[in-house]
Amino acid sequence: MFFSHLGKKNGGPTAKSSDVKRKVTKVKTRKPVVTSVSKSPSPSKTAPPPATAAAAATAAAKPSTPRKSRRKTPNIYQLSKSSLSEVDTEESEREVSSSLSTPGLYELVPRDIVTAGFGSAELATSIHITNASESGNLSMTDIYEPVSTDKSLSDRVKLGALSCDFVEDYSLIKPKVPGEFEPVREILSIMEMTALHFVDKGASEEIKHPVMDDCIMRRFRRSYEGGDLEGMKTSMKEFDEVVKTQRAEGAILANLKQLTAVPQDLAYFLLNQVYSRIVSPESKSLRDYKAFSNNVYGELMPPFMSTVFQKTDLQPSSVFVDLGSGVGNCTLQAALEVGCESWGCEVMTNASSLAEKQKIELYSRAKMFGIKTGDIHLVASSFVHNDEVHSAISRADVLLVNNYAFDGTLNAHLLDMFLDLKEGCKIVSLKSFVPVGHVISEHNIESPVNILKVQKLDFYSGSVSWTAAGGTYYISTVDRSAIKAFLSKGGY
């Protein structure tokens, strides 16, 4: 249900593997998975290597077995929006398990991700969240219905955090309307994340068996499908006991320390948790803007931003700045996924207010999983003539400007700001700041665009909130060598 309340297409992008592969250390993670999943081949390597004569003879000798048709399963980002009823068979349950058990194919930046005070009482008291039982429209009977027809049973349950003795309240109810927050789906995802990344193999298989034989997730799902509220509660208690035991034995902390980055499926899940509680219930307020103005609201989706981080080589030591940051999605994602110092500036009051709430929610939810983020700084004002923003962009390694709807005046002001960017800073935008065919000459020698070296790239379906279609974006690198060379030759 990520961002679905804005009425936009929510599917993840169909990206080429060659466009999203980062050339740095791959995140280390234990994978209690028996199903192998191969990376998609790059466009230049789609043909398989020719079989040897021996291999061909062996293949010919084996009887042909028809392959079982399997529908394509969604990743964690897509699954968070799908209805439980769409994946309620045992076969599809195994497929969903397989897809969720495979970490994203991106290679993530290595860093220490463990939060301070793991397992302590102080960590638990520092967590302040919007409980799942308070999210969205859960109290509206025209949108939600009980799991069980027995009205004497309470649908309230508590689910413990992985890192400390903090619990979150949930209501075990189901939505009647597609796209609404699904508490049961979220609980299943938490179980999945736990089994994949945080516990030892035995505990992992107890929570989610690799081929979905009898396990906690399977029993929980079956109880849900059968309207057995008490059965669901029993499964949740079993899950909590596994988590408490693993934390007490030091297994969760040990497994966290093995991770060299926040797994991408977990990062998207946390962002979705935060968004569904803070932004989704208030999404109507984001439509209150003047059409075709500089304040038109639109969102860049998480998979697209992951690609941007990789293309710009954003590192934990980097500084990321988003000018026109809206509700803070990109700013929060950079701090969580990469772990860098992350800045956002937004002039719209309603959007900047939600951004601040999302920041607080993300800090706490990351702590619940034992994860630390990079520092997040949000400025609720215009970035024009703003000293705090100016100081941040002068240190920026990556500057994001969603200038899709900016007018010429604001784009011109941005260009003037770019003069203070450091050499090598990368500017990501949806419109190029450098005119097509631009050549340095004595007539434009003072133009700020002379310090930019621009690269045009494609984004894929589902990358932005305002259209389902793909499009283009630009990465401009601050490179003063061309203008220096021009001036060294006397300006000719």
From Swiss-Prot:
Primary location group: nucleus
Q: Which UniProt keywords apply?
A: Chromatin regulator, Methyltransferase, Nucleus, Repeat, S-adenosyl-L-methionine, Transcription, Transcription regulation, Transferase
BP term (GO), one: DNA damage checkpoint signaling
Q: Enumerate the residue ranges of region (Disordered).
A: 1-101
Q: What is its EC number?
A: 2.1.1.360
Q: Which reaction is the catalytic activity of this chain?
A: L-lysyl(79)-[histone H3] + 3 S-adenosyl-L-methionine = N(6),N(6),N(6)-trimethyl-L-lysyl(79)-[histone H3] + 3 S-adenosyl-L-homocysteine + 3 H(+)
Q: Does the keyword Transcription regulation apply?
A: yes
- Activity regulation behaviour: Ubiquitination of histone H2B to form H2BK123ub1 is required for efficient DOT1 methyltransferase activity on histone H3.
Q: Name one GO molecular function term.
A: histone binding
Locate the residues binding S-adenosyl-L-methionine: 297-300, 320-329, 346, 382-383
**EC class of the enzyme, as a word:** transferase
Q: Where is the composition biased (Low complexity)?
A: 32-45, 52-64
Q: Which GO terms describe its cellular component?
A: chromosome, telomeric region; nucleosome; nucleus
Query: Which residue intervals define the domain DOT1 in the entry?
Result: 168-491
Asked if Transcription is a keyword of the record, the answer is: yes
Signal peptide location: none
Where located? Nucleus
Top-level taxonomic group: Eukaryota
Q: Per its database record, what is this protein's job?
A: Histone methyltransferase that specifically trimethylates histone H3 to form H3K79me3. This methylation is required for telomere silencing and for the pachytene checkpoint during the meiotic cell cycle by allowing the recruitment of RAD9 to double strand breaks. Nucleosomes are preferred as substrate compared to free histone.
Record-stated family: Belongs to the class I-like SAM-binding methyltransferase superfamily. DOT1 family.
Additional comment: In contrast to other lysine histone methyltransferases, it does not contain a SET domain, suggesting the existence of another mechanism for methylation of lysine residues of histones.
Protein known as: Histone-lysine N-methyltransferase, H3 lysine-79 specific
Q: What gene name is listed for this protein?
A: DOT1
